A protein has these predicted regions:
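Short, flexible, glycine/charge-rich loop motifs used to bind or transfer phosphoryl groups or to couple energy/partner
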Residues: 29-31, 38-40, 73-75
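Acidic-basic catalytic patches of nuclease active cores, encompassing PD-(D/E)XK
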Residues: 1-36, 55-56
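Residues that flank catalytic or metal-binding motifs in active/ligand-binding sites
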Residues: 36, 45, 80
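Intrinsically disordered, low-complexity regions of eukaryotic proteins
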Residues: 16, 41, 52, 68, ...
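Non-catalytic C-terminal interaction segments of nucleic acid-processing enzymes
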Residues: 61, 90-148
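Alpha-helix C-terminal capping segments
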Residues: 17-22, 40-44, 84
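Catalytic cores of nucleic-acid endonucleases
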Residues: 4, 27, 53-98
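Conserved catalytic cores of phosphodiester-cleaving nucleases, focusing on short active-site segments
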Residues: 40-57
Length: 148
C-alpha cells in the first residue's frame, strides 16, 4: 500500500466515525487539512478524536499504534485527543490514549521499528498489540460489517 492509498482509506474512516458522532453530537466536524492534535472535534463536549483505520488487523491479529516518526515522538506519545476511534474491518473500538498506554505498560510491549512505506520518508516505531488484548482496554467496541 502507498502512503496516498493509506491516506484516502484513513479519510474514509474519519467520515465513517463522524457520521456516527452526528447522531448524538450534530455539531461535530472533521478538521480541515493536516492537524496533528486530532481528526474530529466535538464542540458540544470540547473534545478531539483521533481516528485510526487498519485494514490488516483481520489478517495479522494486531492493531498498530505509532510512537515515533523518524526519531521524533508521534502518535500515542504526542496525541492531544481525548479519544481514539480505532477501526478494523469488523470492529470500531473507542479507547482513550491513557488506556492504550496502560495496555502497553501492563503487558511490557515494546515498539518495533519499520522502514518507510512507498510515498513516506521516514521510519516508524510501532506497537503491535493483539486485537484481543486491545479490546480488553477499549471503553467500547462496536461490530461493523466488513468495511473496506
Amino acid at each position: 500500500m502507498s502512503f496516498q492509498t493509506d491516506l484516502n482509506f484513513g479519510e474514509q474512516g474519519e467520515l465513517f466515525v463522524l457520521e456516527k458522532l452526528h447522531y448524538k453530537y450534530p455539531k461535530a466536524y472533521k478538521v480541515k487539512g493536516y492537524y496533528k492534535e486530532w481528526d474530529l472535534f466535538i464542540p458540544e463536549k470540547d473534545v478531539g478524536i483521533e481516528v485510526k483505520s487498519d485494514r490488516a488487523t483481520h489478517k495479522t491479529g494486531n492493531v498498530v499504534i505509532e510512537s515515533k516518526y523518524g526519531d521524533a515522538p508521534s502518535g500515542i506519545e504526542t496525541t492531544k485527543a481525548a479519544w481514539w476511534a480505532y477501526i478494523t474491518k469488523d470492529n470500531l473500538y473507542w479507547i482513550t490514549p491513557d488506556k492504550i498506554k496502560e495496555c502497553i505498560k501492563d503487558n511490557n510491549l515494546e515498539a518495533r521499528e519499520f522502514p518507510p512505506v512507498e510515498g513516506d520518508f521516514k521510519k516508524k516505531s510501532l506497537y503491535l498489540i493483539k486485537e484481543t488484548l486491545f479490546k480488553k482496554y477499549a471503553k467500547r467496541s462496536e461490530r461493523i460489517d466488513g468495511r473496506n
